[in-house]
């Protein structure tokens, strides 16, 4: 059992998880064991007293840009991708509530019989009451990624940081899965990321985080307990902030 009593650097964070992470070792869809592992990590954070909201991608089910590349009309493909994020959000809500974490899903596309609509002040009240809020359906608009949605919600919720949980333990000079000589950055500025096109998040998301002065912390969510470790400023990760000394 992880020690959740250590002091935390942040009061409120947004956790962005790619849909691909939820596949686990399966080629498609939702791996329930992986969802449960992420839910247990989130539960540890909530137990430590940090307020947490969550954005999950939909790439494990459908990716709008991939559909558009195969000839689909981009808006239709993006809406399908947004609906995929709702499926992932409901799976995560179920996993969290089964271990006793109060959770609300808010969708940018209204679907009243399934979840709450996105209402900023209501979401803030949920967080203040110790509930996890999962933001689904991206921004509700095509042509915007879930990275941009995560950045937008982090700014609206006045989060202290955006944690991006991926399958890689930080930001590298090249794809470490393809280039064994790739080196990991400990810290980067927002301008470094944009100028070097490092693909931490899409450019609009990075620019919004820069304008809101919200650090981006990139880490691997695949290791159990990594989220709490990185939250304490420990473990392997990359911080993107106003300057390298931030």
UniProtKB/Swiss-Prot annotation:
Class of the enzyme per the UniProt entry, highest EC level: transferase
Compartments, as annotated in UniProt: Cytoplasm
Protein name: Uridylate kinase
Pathway: Pyrimidine metabolism; CTP biosynthesis via de novo pathway; UDP from UMP (UMPK route): step 1/1
One GO process term, biological-process aspect: UDP biosynthetic process
Catalysed transformations (reactions): UMP + ATP = UDP + ADP
Binding residue positions for UMP: 58, 78, 139-146
Organism from which the protein derives: Caulobacter vibrioides (strain ATCC 19089 / CIP 103742 / CB 15)
Gene encoding the protein: pyrH
Keyword field: ATP-binding, Cytoplasm, Kinase, Nucleotide-binding, Pyrimidine biosynthesis, Transferase
Any single GO CC term annotated in Swiss-Prot or TrEMBL for this entry: cytosol
PANTHER family, alphabetized: URIDYLATE KINASE, URIDYLATE KINASE PUMPKIN, CHLOROPLASTIC
Pfam families membership: AA_kinase
Regulation: Inhibited by UTP.
Family: Belongs to the UMP kinase family.
InterPro entries, sorted: AceGlu_kinase-like_sf, Asp/Glu/Uridylate_kinase, Uridylate_kinase, Uridylate_kinase_bac
EC annotation from Swiss-Prot or TrEMBL: 2.7.4.22
